[in-house]
Each structure stands twice: as C-alpha cells, then as structure tokens.
C-alpha cells in the first residue's frame, strides 16, 4: 500500500539534491483526469468532510487519549499539541474529536493511509458520448469549416489568391452540408447564422480579388437578400466597389446610396467613407458638379485631406478660379491632429526621457509622419495644379499660394513652393528668372539653402559653367553635409575637370549618406570606366540594374563595359535587352549592327543597320555602311540611293558625289557616270580626283572634252605645287606630307576598287577623301578608283579587247597629252 509514498532517507546526507525530483504522484494534477479514484470522488460525495459538531477539549493537549484498545502515548509537537497523524506501528489516525475525511476505524486494524480511497479501485465511468453521434459530427464539421475560412484568409494575405478562392469554395460546400445535417437533427432556429455569414462573405471577397465580379455580385446578393443576416445591407458598398471597377458608374452610385441609407447617422465615419466613394465615382464619370456636392458636404461635416484635395481638382476641372482658391484654403486648414510637443522631454527625469525616446519612432509616430507627408504631397500638388490658372500669370498664382501657405500650419512648404516656381520658369525656358529665385532662397535657412544651392549647382553645370557649379555645390554641402544630391553635384564638377579619383570619393560619400542615390551610383560607374577599372564599373552598373530593372541607360552602360572588356557576345546580349526596352532607338540599333559586323555576321549587321536607318535616316555612318554593304554584294543601284542621300546631308563633301559616279560607272551606265562627274566638277572645280576621272572617262569614250579637262588638271596640279612650296618654306616637314599626299593620289588611280577587301569597312576609304575643311585637295589615304581595271572582270557591254587595252600602262599615249598629266 505504501509503494506510492516516497520518504526521503534520513541516513543519506552526502547528496544534497537526492530525491529533489521525486514527488508524490498524488499531486500530479496532469494525471488526475485518468485517476479513477479521483474521478469517483469528484462525481460522488465520497470523502467529503462532515460538518463540525464539537470542539476539541483543552485537556487533549496535556493528557493521553484512551481508546478501546488501551492507553496510547501521544507525540507532542513543537508547539505543545499532539500530532494528529501518527500512532504506534506506523498506523496514522486523527487526533481530534471529529474524525477527518478519509480516516476510518480500519486504520486501527493496520490499514495504510489512503485519503483518496485509491484502494477501493476505479469507479464506474460516466457514460461517454459516442463519437459518431450527430452532435459530434456537426461540431467536427463546424470546426473544419472554420479552419477552411481561416486558411483562405491566410492564403489571401500571402498573395496566393487562387488557393484562397479554392479554400473559400471548400468552406462553402462543407457549410451547406453542415446546414442540411443540422436541419435533420435540430430545429432551423439552431442554425449557426454567424458561420454561414462568414463563409459567404469570405467567398464573395475571394471572388472579387480574383476579378470574378459576376460570381462575387451573386454571392453578395445572397447575403443581402437574406433577412436573417443583421447589418447585411452595408455590403451593398462592396457591390458598389465592384461596379466601379467594372466602370458601371450609375449602378455603383445606386448601390453606394443604398448602403448610405442603411448606415445609421451615429456611424459618421462609415457614412463619410461611402460619400467619398460616391464623389470618386462622379469624378470618374465626369460629373464634376455632383462630385463637388458630395465633397462640399464632407468638408462641412468632417473635413479630411483626400476630400479637400479632390474638391480642389473638381473646381480645377470646371475652371472656377474663386472656388479653387476656397477649396485650397479648406485643404490647408484640415487639422493633422499631430502633437509634436509630446516628443519633446520637458524635464530632466531619466524615466520621462526614456519614454520620450521610445515613442519617437514607434508605429504611431510613423503613422503620423506618413499622414504629414501625405498632407504635404496633396498641398504641393494642388498648388502646382492651380497656380498657373488662378491668376493672370503663373508667377502671381504661385505668390498667392505661397502667402496662403505661410499663414497656415505648413509654413515650411512655402520655400518648397518657391523652388517649384523656379522649376516652372525652367520649363518655360526662362533661365534667368529661375536663377534669381534660387539665389534668393539660397540666402535663407540651412535646409532651403542647401536645396537652392543644389539646384543652382545643377543649372550652372548644365550651362558648362563649372566654376559656379563647383561654388554652389560647396555651399550646398556646407549647409547640409548629408545631402546626397549636393555631393553628387560636387562630384560632377570634379569629374568635368578630369579629377576622376576625387570625383569617385564624392560619389562614395553620397552613397554612404543615401544608399538609394541612383545618380551617385551611376556616376561612380562612369568614373571607374574612365579610370579603366572595368570590373568595378561593371559591379556598380549591375547593382544599379538590380534597383532599376528597366533602365535603358544602365543596360547600355553594361553592354558598353562588356565591349570594352572585349566580350562582344555579352555586349550583344545586353544590347538586345536595351532594344526590348526601347525598340526604336537608332543609336542602339546601329551599335548592334557594328558589333555583329565585327563578329563577321553581315546579315545580322545589315538587319540592325537597316532598322537604325529607318528610324533615323540622317546618320552618315549608317548610310556609309549600308552603301558599302550593297557594293560588296554588287547591288550598285541600291548603293547609289544611299550615297545620293549622303550627298544631300553633306552637300559640301565631294566624296559622296564621287561615290555616286563610281557606282554608275560600275553598273555600266557610263553616260550617267560622265554627267555626274561633270556636275561634280562644276560644284568643285578644283578637285583633282574628279578631273582625273573625267580625263580617263572622256579618253575611253573618245570625247573631245578630254583635252580641255587635261589642261585644267595640269594647271590645277601646278597651282597645288606652288601652294605646297609656300607651305614648305614657312613650315618644316611639310614636304614629306606633300609627297605622301601625292603618292596616295597617284596610287589610288591604279588600284582596284573594293569596299570590303580583307574585311575593311568602306568608311576607312571614304575618310581618305577630302573633308569639309579641305574640299579640293587630294586625300592622304586611299581614294576612290578612277581606272577601268575592275575586279569584277570585263563589262558585258564592252569588248574583251577594250578590257585588255585598259590594262595596258600606255592607255593615255597621246601626243597632245603630256606624260605629266597622266595619273601615276
């Protein structure tokens, strides 16, 4: 019987903690539910103490108690009274006049101490309910429905809208099963209406967010039409929201008004929100007068920022200047309900200071900051919107807005409005007025001073006045050391002066102050590119690309870095991303064509060059490449079209007209080629190359004009020799350049024309022709071929003997023409 009683041993004194975790299982309350004896005691009156009917005699303390079994000696306690729980032979019994609960006469016969009557065995348990009973099934089904609704809401909050809808549908199906089962077991009055309402409302909400508006409206109709649901009429506002999304403005307004009628007047906030929705619907429907009525009512009952802002927009839409002013004044008088004084510690009490510091950045303070930022945004936007129209000029309008703001609780916004006024002047190309306003602001307090100086620095930088830009950048930095825009402007001025290392330091400082300053990150990438630190530049642009995913400038810079790193495949890949962002940029398309040309993919290069030409047909380099491409493929007529366009774009460049004539000659149209050469000679009478081509072509065609052109060529060459001698006498070393120039001209006359021999672009040859500065002198590089020795072989129209004759060096053997007139 005593196996459940654990007594601490008296002799074991070595281990102080022995038996520390031992306890009497009687006191294990967690197992009481499974304790049959305890459950019997709870269900019955077994073991309860009877009411006390006598008092303990005072003599019981001093004399032993005699029983029917003989006199026993009592054990005195430390306070002089007998211990009530111990007798001889280890059998315990009460030592009071009243028998305690759990003590019987059986204890005197050697029974163990059993206060809970565990020796009697477990009592018969109460009849348990069957798990498959209808009530248990209903409870279990209710639990499952609630869990499905919760899971649907959680999935919606996590952004998994499809899963949320599926869970809501499952909850609806199980709820209908639950209703049918409950109707079979109990009366209809016992149906859980709250559960039905929550299931239907959640299902309608999930339909709405999944843009299944018809199903959502049907579900809301089921709720609204059921008179058993209290306050279901407010859901008509949700139905109005759905109609608003569907742009069914008349029905949206109808349901908003029905919801408004069912909201009691004491619920003022809800009524205000519904009226705001009505106003927004009227604005989207273009009914500004009706919207004005709604917002005017709101501003008279409970003015708020959104209503005041929308009211200003409505008056702007109908063009009422005076009402615009009044609406703006109402907007700036809306109370913010922000107490700034509570964030200032009034005493030196450390506890108070600690509390003040704790609430300076708590959630409530963050909400107040967001509310203030929203108010400033609405006021600034409204001022910029109405300032150009409320007065005769936008300057007067801004002045009126500034005066009104200065007299309100938003005094600090007045300076921001002045800066916006300067920006407006810049948009109107009035540079001087903008600078004057910013210079006035630059003399005010530090915050405005820094902003004004930053803008002035940017203006002077764009005007190439780097000294003034640097000066104002210094002022801005000194006024606010943590202004990233000021540090970026200072870095720009240093960058313009070529000190790239110092510029990088300013950009780094700007990034340390504001890690989201994309301008500084972009500029530091350009700086590293200038310093030829390409890996670091690439890291900067890749970081910027992670922030600005669709920035064409950043993508182009990454492609440019890969090109500098001699990785054309990666450069092409990034340029393709640029084209996906801005598919009509001719510069990017021409760059792609250039890279494909370097890789030897002429077909892809032609595709992108042609696309670039379509979007911008005035790019000389693109026209030049396309002309060379058609020459390579021997489509002379196509090449003529591009060179003629180039001659229109650069009429002072003789090389384009010479190229046109050369293409005519190669296509076999000698008469057209001769006319083109003659026309070129009339425009550029001192061009040596044109005269040489005329002499050769007229001689081959047997024309009498050959003698005249030969005399002009001889006279022109003599004049050129005299000019070169004068240059040589005044400057040393010019003779070598003259020899190089003459040798180049003579060598070109005898060489075959090939625009792409050995992979060379035509531009390398065309640049050898005279430019705009020296239109009549021969070039120092290869010139356009003037001979008839053609790499394509003999022309079909010409006999073979003529082709052989052209190869002969004595083509111009004529007694009237001197050898000095022939091209070397």
From Swiss-Prot:
Q: Where does this protein chiefly localize?
A: cytoplasm
SMART domains, per the entry: SEL1, TPR
- Would the keyword Transferase be found if you checked this record's keyword annotation? no
What ranges does the record list as Basic and acidic residues composition bias? 797-808
Location of this chain's protein in the cell: Cytoplasm, Cytoskeleton, Microtubule organizing center, Centrosome, Centriole; Cell projection, Cilium; Cytoplasm, Cytoskeleton, Cilium basal body; Cytoplasm, Cytoskeleton, Microtubule organizing center, Centrosome
Q: Among its keywords, does the record have Cytoplasm?
A: yes
Which Gene Ontology CC terms are recorded?
A: centriolar satellite; centriole; centrosome; ciliary basal body; ciliary base; ciliary tip; cilium; cytosol
Could you tell me the keywords of this UniProt record? Cell projection, Cilium, Cilium biogenesis/degradation, Cytoplasm, Cytoskeleton, Flagellum, Repeat, TPR repeat
Region feature Disordered, mapped onto this chain: 113-134, 724-824
Q: Which InterPro entries match?
A: Sel1-like, TPR-like_helical_dom_sf, TPR_rpt
Query: Biased-composition ranges for Acidic residues?
Result: 809-824
Tissue expression from the record: Expressed in the heart, brain, liver, lung, kidney, skeletal muscle and pancreas.
Signal sequence interval, chain numbering:
none
Q: How does it assemble?
A: Component of the IFT complex B, at least composed of IFT20, IFT22, IFT25, IFT27, IFT46, IFT52, TRAF3IP1/IFT54, IFT57, IFT74, IFT80, IFT81, and IFT88. Interacts with IFT20, IFT22, IFT25, IFT27, IFT52, TRAF3IP1, IFT74, IFT80 and IFT81. Interacts with IFT172. Interacts with IFT57. Interacts with IFT46. Interacts with IFT70B. Interacts with C2CD3. Interacts with ENTR1 (via N-terminus). Interacts with LRRC56. Interacts with DZIP1. Interacts with CCDC38. Interacts with CCDC146. Interacts with CFAP53.
This protein's name: Intraflagellar transport protein 88 homolog
The organism encoding this protein is Homo sapiens
| Organism classification | Eukaryota, Metazoa, Chordata, Craniata, Vertebrata
């Amino acid at each position: 019987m005593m196996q459940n009683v654990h007594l601490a041993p008296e002799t074991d004194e070595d281990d102080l903690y022995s038996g520390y975790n031992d306890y009497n299982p009687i006191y294990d309350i967690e197992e009481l539910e499974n304790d049959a004896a305890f459950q019997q005691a709870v269900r019955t009156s077994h073991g309860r103490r009877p009411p006390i009917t006598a008092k303990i005699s005072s003599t019981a303390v001093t004399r032993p108690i005699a029983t029917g079994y003989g006199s026993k000696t009592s054990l005195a306690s430390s306070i002089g009274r007998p211990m009530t729980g111990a007798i001889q032979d280890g059998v315990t019994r009460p030592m009071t006049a009243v028998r305690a609960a759990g003590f019987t006469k059986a204890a005197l016969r050697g029974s163990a101490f059993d206060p809970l009557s565990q020796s009697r065995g477990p009592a018969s348990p109460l009849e348990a309910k069957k798990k498959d009973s209808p009530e248990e099934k209903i409870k279990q089904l209710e639990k499952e429905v609630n869990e499905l609704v919760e899971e649907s809401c959680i999935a919606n909050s996590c952004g998994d809208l499809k899963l949320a809808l599926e869970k809501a549908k499952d909850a609806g199906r199980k709820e209908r099963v639950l209703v049918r089962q409950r109707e079979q077991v109990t009366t209809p009055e016992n149906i859980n209406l709250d559960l039905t309402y929550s299931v239907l409302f959640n299902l309608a909400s999930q339909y709405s967010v999944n843009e299944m508006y018809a199903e959502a409206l049907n579900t809301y109709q089921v709720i609204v039409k059921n008179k058993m649901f209290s306050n279901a009429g407010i859901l008509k506002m949700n139905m109005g929201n759905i109609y608003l999304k569907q742009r069914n403005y008349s029905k949206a307004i109808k349901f908003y008004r029905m919801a408004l009628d069912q909201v009691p007047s004491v619920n003022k906030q809800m009524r205000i929100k519904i009226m705001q929705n009505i106003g927004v619907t009227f604005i989207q429907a273009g009914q500004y007068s009706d919207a004005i009525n709604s917002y005017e009512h709101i501003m008279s009952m409970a003015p708020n920022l959104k209503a005041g802002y929308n009211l200003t927009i409505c008056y702007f839409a109908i063009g009422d200047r005076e009402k615009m002013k009044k609406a703006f004044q109402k907007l700036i008088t809306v109370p913010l309900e922000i107490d700034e004084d509570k964030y200032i510690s009034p005493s030196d009490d450390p506890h108070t200071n600690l509390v003040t510091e704790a609430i300076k950045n708590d959630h409530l303070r963050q909400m107040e900051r967001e509310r203030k930022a929203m108010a400033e945004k609405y006021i600034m936007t409204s001022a910029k919107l109405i300032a150009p129209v409320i007065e005769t000029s936008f300057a007067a309008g801004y002045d009126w807005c500034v005066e009104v703001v200065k007299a309100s609780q938003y005094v600090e916004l007045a300076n921001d409005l002045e800066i916006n006024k300067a920006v407006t002047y810049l948009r109107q190309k009035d540079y001087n007025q903008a600078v004057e306003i910013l210079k006035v602001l630059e003399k005010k307090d530090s915050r405005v001073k820094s902003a004004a100086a930053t803008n002035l620095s940017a203006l002077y930088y764009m005007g190439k006045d780097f000294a003034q830009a640097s000066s104002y950048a210094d002022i801005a930095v000194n006024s606010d050391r943590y202004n990233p825009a000021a540090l970026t402007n200072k870095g720009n001025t240093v960058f313009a002066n070529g000190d790239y290392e110092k510029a990088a330091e300013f950009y780094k400082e700007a990034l340390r102050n504001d890690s989201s300053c994309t301008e500084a990150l972009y500029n530091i990438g350009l700086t590293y590119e200038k310093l030829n630190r390409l890996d670091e530049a690439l890291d900067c642009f890749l970081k910027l690309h992670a922030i600005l995913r669709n920035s064409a400038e950043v993508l182009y810079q990454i492609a440019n870095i890969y090109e500098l790193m001699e990785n054309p495949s990666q450069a092409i890949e990034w340029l393709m991303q640029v084209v996906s962002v801005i598919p009509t940029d001719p510069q990017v398309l021409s760059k792609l064509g250039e890279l494909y040309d370097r890789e030897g993919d002429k077909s892809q290069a032609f595709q992108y060059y042609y696309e670039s030409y379509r979007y911008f047909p005035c790019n000389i380099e693109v026209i030049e490449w396309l002309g060379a491409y058609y020459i390579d493929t021997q489509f002379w007529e196509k090449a003529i079209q591009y060179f003629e366009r180039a001659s229109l774009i650069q009429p002072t460049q003789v090389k384009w007209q010479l190229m046109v004539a050369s293409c005519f000659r190669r296509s076999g149209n000698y008469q057209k080629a001769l006319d083109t050469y003659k026309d070129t000679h009339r425009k550029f009478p001192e061009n040596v190359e044109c005269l040489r081509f005329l002499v050769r072509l007229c001689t081959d065609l047997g024309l009498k004009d050959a003698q005249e052109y030969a005399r002009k060529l001889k006279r022109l060459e003599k004049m050129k020799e005299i000019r070169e001698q004068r240059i040589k006498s005044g400057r040393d070393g010019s003779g070598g350049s003259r020899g190089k120039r003459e040798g180049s001209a003579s060598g070109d006359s005898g060489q075959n024309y090939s625009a792409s021999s050995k992979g060379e672009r035509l531009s390398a040859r065309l640049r050898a022709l005279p430019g705009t500065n020296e239109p009549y002198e021969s070039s120092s590089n290869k010139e356009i071929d003037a001979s008839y020795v053609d790499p394509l072989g003999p022309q079909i129209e010409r006999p073979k003997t003529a082709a052989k004759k052209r190869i002969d060096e004595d083509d111009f053997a004529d007694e009237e023409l001197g050898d000095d007139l022939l091209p070397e």
